[in-house]
Structures are given as C-alpha cells and as structure tokens.
Amino acid sequence: MAAKTGSQLERSISTIINVFHQYSRKYGHPDTLNKAEFKEMVNKDLPNFLKREKRNENLLRDIMEDLDTNQDNQLSFEECMMLMGKLIFACHEKLHENNPRGHDHSHGKGCGK
C-alpha cells in the first residue's frame, strides 16, 4: 500500500506500520523493537505520550514489560499494536472529555493538545 494512495484510514495504517519499521530495523531483529528502539520511538514519535510523567524511565520499562507478552525482551508488531490500541482509545476518550455532548458527537481538544 503506497503512502499517497488509499483512504485516510488506510494511509494512517500504513504510517503506523512504516514508523514501527523505521525503529525496528535499527538494531537486532528487523521486525521487533528492543528496549532502545522502543524508547526512541516513544520519545521521538509519541512526544506527548509521557508528557505528564516527564518521560519517566521506569514507566517506559513497565509499559514494555506489560506489552511483552512472550517475555523475550522484544516487542513484536502485534505487541506494539496493543499500545497503539490503548492510546487510540485514550485519545478518543480525551476528545470527549468535558464535552457537554459526550459521545453525541462533538470533539474537544485531542491527545497532546
């Protein structure tokens, strides 16, 4: 799937895959994220993710351990997508936070704003 073709959602999916591989190919196995790759991805491509926690190193370690379901100290694409799913859900909830219409359907400030 080319980045310039397809629907907005298809392009978004392609972007997520491409960003994952941008980091997974740096060291070790080309299809998993090690701790350094995961940390770099979160710090560079999810800069607002740990904004409140001030990029707490222990929190990053704990998140990776929680996602690493097979305990191989690597995150597969599937394991990493568990984080993306949780972030998307949290962002969706934040969009509706303090909105008098709730989920009936107006959006406030999104994630990272």
Curated annotation (Swiss-Prot):
CDD domains: calgranulins. The keyword Phosphoprotein applies. Zn(2+) binds at residues 21, 31, 92, 96. One of its GO terms (cellular component) is cytoskeleton. Phosphorylated. Phosphorylation inhibits activation of tubulin polymerization. The modification N-acetylalanine is found at residue 2. Gene3D superfamilies: EF-hand. The keyword Signal does not apply. Residues 13-48, 55-90 form the EF-hand domain. The modification Pros-methylhistidine is found at residue 107. S100A9 is a calcium- and zinc-binding protein which plays a prominent role in the regulation of inflammatory processes and immune response. It can induce neutrophil chemotaxis, adhesion, can increase the bactericidal activity of neutrophils by promoting phagocytosis via activation of SYK, PI3K/AKT, and ERK1/2 and can induce degranulation of neutrophils by a MAPK-dependent mechanism. Predominantly found as calprotectin (S100A8/A9) which has a wide plethora of intra- and extracellular functions. Homodimer. Preferentially exists as a heterodimer or heterotetramer with S100A8 known as calprotectin (S100A8/A9). S100A9 interacts with ATP2A2. S100A9 interacts with AGER, and with the heterodimeric complex formed by TLR4 and LY96 in the presence of calcium and/or zinc ions. S100A9 binds quinoline-3-carboxamides in the presence of calcium and/or zinc ions. S100A9 interacts with amyloid-beta protein 40. Calprotectin (S100A8/9) interacts with CEACAM3 and tubulin filaments in a calcium-dependent manner. This is Protein S100-A9. It comes from Rattus norvegicus.
